[in-house]
Structure formats: C-alpha cells, structure tokens
Amino acid sequence: MDFFSEYGDSSRYKIQEIVGKGSYGVVCSAIDQHTGDKVAIKKIHNIFEHLSDAARILREIKLLRLLRHPDIVEIKHIMLPPSRRDFKDIYVVFELMDTDLHQVIKANDDLTKEHHQFFLYQMLRALKYIHTANVYHRDLKPKNILANANCKLKICDFGLARVAFNDTPTTVFWTDYVATRWYRAPELCGSFFSKYSPAIDTWSIGCIFAEILTGKPLFPGKNVVHQLDLMTDLLGTPSMDAISRIRNDKARRYLSSMRRKQPVPFSEKFPNVDPLALKLLQRLLAFDPKDRPTAEEALADPYFKGLAKVEREPSCQPISKMEFEFERRKVTKDDIKELIFREILEYHPQLLKDYMNGSENTSFLYPSAVDNFRRQFAILEENGGKSGALDRKHVSLPRATTVHSTSIPPNEGLDATSQVTQRIPTARPGRTVGPVLPFENPGAADPHSARRVVRNPMVPPAAANKSGYSYNLKSDYSDRQHQEELEKDRVQYRPAQHLMDAKVAPDTAPDIRSSQYYFTRSAPRTDLTDRAALQGSMLYGIAPFNGIAAVAGGYSKVGAVQYGVSRMY
C-alpha cells in the first residue's frame, strides 16, 4: 500500500487495513513494530492548501498534546517529515480504538442501565478535565467519541475547540457553522457571532446521553427554526430572560412570538429509564445556560453515587496564552507550517532540543548514519546479543569495542575501590551530551552513585589506562605527574586510526577501550566528590549534530559511546 510516500521512518509501522476516509485523507490501522501496539495512523494530505484547515490541524494536535487524560484520545507519535520546509502531508499516530459511540448506539438496542451510567460518567469526567484547562470542545457528538468493546470511551476531534483566556473576550466569530446542529446549544442557534461558555458542551453531552437512552437523536432539526421547535416541544417555551441570551435576531424574535408551550415530563419522553438519570438529564438540557451544571457539579449528582468521587477526578492546569498566540494574530501559511513542524518535534525530543537551541541542522531529519547504527544496535540488544556486532562501513568510524557489563559476577577476592567519574562538560548549542546525572550534593541519595570498580579480565594490567574519567580518590600522583601519565597513556593507547573522535570532541570523548575496570552496582557507597556520577552502562560522548557517529559494543547490556542525537523513538 502506497501510504507513507517518502517518509523515512515508515518501516516502523506495518499497515493492516484502511479504517476510515474523508476529505482530510485516510486512516489506517497498523502495528507499531517497535512496541507491538496496535495503532491508527491518520494521513492528512495537502494540509497547507487552505489556511483555515492548517490552523484547525495545528489546534487539534496542540490540544491533544496538552490534554492528557484517560478519557481523551492520545497522540502517540507524529512522524517526521522528510523536509522542514517542503512537507505537505503529516502522519499522526493515535491509539487504536474499535469504533465510535455513533456506531455503538446504532448497533446496540439492548444497552443496560450500567452502560448508560458508565458512558455518561466517562464523558463528564473528560469534560471536567477539558473545562478546567479553559478549553471548550464545541463539537461534541457521538461520532467524536471513540469507543472500545470494553465500553471505554475517549473524546476526539478538537479541531473546532477554543481556549478561553481571562484577559481576552470570549466572543468569537463562529466560522464553523457546518458543525452538527443537532447537538448545538440553543443560545448558538443561527448565531455566527456568539459569546460562549462551558455550558455549550454540557448541552451537547445531554443530547448525546438522551441518544444513548433512546437509540436515536433527540433534536434532529432540519434547519434553525425546526431545531428550536423540537427543543421547545420537549422543554417548553423558555423565559424571556433565556430568550434574551440568544444572539441571533431572527431566532430571538421567533421564540418571543411563539405560542406558549408546556414542557413534557421526562418520564413520559424516556420511559423505563432510571429516575436519577432523568433528573440529571433535565439539568443538562436546561434551556438557559446559567441553569446547566458544570461537569464537576454533574459528577457530584446522586446518579453517580458509588461510582464517582469528584475530588478524585483529575483537573488540568489552564493552558498558557502563548500556546495559542497564532489564534490572535494574522499568520501566513509559512507561519502555520513552522508551528506545525514545532509541534511534530514535541514527539522527537532531541530534535526539539536542537531546534530550541537554534541549531540549523533540524532540516536534517533522516535517514542518517547515526539513526541507522542506533537502530541496528537497539535490535541487537533486544535480541539478547545472540548475533555479533555489525561490520562498520565507514573508515572514519572507530573499530568495534566490547565493554563488559555488570552481568559478570565479580570475584570476591579482587580488590575494590570506590571511584567516581569526572563531570562531563555541558553541550554547546548544536551539540548533544548523554544523560549525565548532576551530583552537586554529595549527601543526596542517588541509586547510581555507588560503584565498585573490578578488574576487567579482557585487558592485561600492563595496558591499564589511568583515564581522566575514572579517578582514584586516593591517588599518590602529584598533579603534574598525573597529567604526564595521562598524556603518556593517551599517546600509547590511542592508535592513529582512532583519533577522529578525539578531534571532533577533544574535551569530552572518553577512551574506554583499554580500561582494566568496569563498574558494578553492588558495593556500598563511600566518599564522593562533587563531580558528576555517570552510569557505567551509559557512557556518552558528544559530537556535532550531524557529525560522525561512534558506537561501541556488540553485545546486550554493554556500555556504549553514542554520538549525535538521542534515540528518536
């Protein structure tokens, strides 16, 4: 299937089948061959053809990154485009869900009271989280709520959502009138320009819950007038105060001139339904928005007694105004493209770090030699070291070196000396350093700080290198003698063909090939200095972002010198 075009990491996913199509593109189910998880990959093509579509996509992927909740669909990954400047499609990887609530309602006419309660509980729990972030979904409907066979629901499609900020007006131009009218609150009927509040989502949840109870839409209006007729047939004629909140002049005049209607008892409209469920539904469908409960208040309703504990339900911190600055200023397609690229990098942390540091090398995405070597050695480690190290194909790379791991039990008869490593300098912009653990406080507890240095049986004592990265805390050398010894060892034990890494990063590239010691983790902790404690099984050097990659070790759980960017997956 020609699905990924020229995207470089497409081999990570094994496409299964097409599960959806639309004007935006196509959705396929797939297997993530790195994790074994089933995923849904949404290919959105020509995203910059229309600026409004691109802004909607940016809004959705940004909100789904910021709103992490069990009842909101999760973006697991966004594939890197082959070019920072010229990409047109994006591939968003979601967790795979079986179906949506619309299909569940249509296919099941025997949903139980427990189903009804659990479905509403999950929707309100997600809504509470969304609203505490000052986000309004604005397009809640059964098709935008995904479902699994185990009755798990997740809200999706935040393309029409908006974030409200305390210092800005909440009145916005309602550009997306094509959103489904059936689930739209009465104060929005016919309005292209409206002030909105969280109550619009509460109304939508009420309409969805009524559809779950009956199996059919509650207010399937053919137009605005018909929609208002259906609402008032059930709820009765609203008060003049409620009518005044409707911004559309024609809708307001129509309701004001309407004959008086009495509300229909919900017990007649919804027979054989739990009375507590009907009381809550009536609150959710209050015509006046100020009479509707918040999601948090609805979760505290007696209907959820024994199921929900409001104080236990998670809330979200309000979203920063800077995240949605693009909503309040005029932007070009290039601006939106750069912002979408920035969002994609959120799923590739090392590239994001380089991007934020101002590195121009973020245009180099793949496939690089660094990535290929990293992927090969990851496979070797996953296979338990059953196959040997791969042959190097570039003469500038160091030869393969085996660094023993702590899996070899130390001989109790050998001398042990507590040692720590020297602090590795912080990387400059455009360069990366492996995960060094700062050890500014020697008294702080650190599970990686205690080390036992045991004789490496693979290196003869005569070849021992007094490396600057493995100091003996009780050395008898003077500073001058010590430096002379280091220089002598460096000349003696670093052959000419292996000097490339020292030239690239002379201050940070450790020589671990001839060390007679390896670290163990069993010894008790002794005196420590304020130097950095570096985990023995994760030694990192640094090099320019697009520099030469050097990797050591062909076996499982061995130490490695890793150059370039960190693992992107």
UniProtKB/Swiss-Prot annotation:
Reactions listed under catalytic activity: L-seryl-[protein] + ATP = O-phospho-L-seryl-[protein] + ADP + H(+); L-threonyl-[protein] + ATP = O-phospho-L-threonyl-[protein] + ADP + H(+)
Occurrences of domain Protein kinase (ranges): 13-304
CDD domains, sorted: STKc_TDY_MAPK
Pfam families associated with the record: Pkinase
Entry EC no(s): 2.7.11.24
Active-site positions on this chain: D139
Cellular component GO terms, alphabetical: cytoplasm; nucleus
PROSITE patterns assigned to the protein according to its UniProt record, in alphabetical order: MAPK, PROTEIN_KINASE_ATP, PROTEIN_KINASE_DOM
Record has Cell cycle as a keyword: no
UniProt modification remark: Dually phosphorylated on Thr-175 and Tyr-177, which activates the enzyme.
A Gene Ontology molecular function term of the record: protein serine kinase activity
Induction record: By jasmonic acid (JA) and infection with rice blast fungus (M.grisea).
GO terms (BP aspect): intracellular signal transduction
Keywords noted in UniProt: ATP-binding, Kinase, Nucleotide-binding, Phosphoprotein, Serine/threonine-protein kinase, Transferase
Residues with Phosphotyrosine modification: Y177
Span(s) of short sequence motif TXY: 175-177
Modified residues (Phosphothreonine): T175
Binding of ATP, residues: V19, G20, K21, G22, S23, Y24, G25, V26, V27, K42
Family: Belongs to the protein kinase superfamily. CMGC Ser/Thr protein kinase family. MAP kinase subfamily.
Protein name as annotated: Mitogen-activated protein kinase 7
Native species: Oryza sativa subsp. japonica
Gene that this polypeptide is encoded by: MPK7
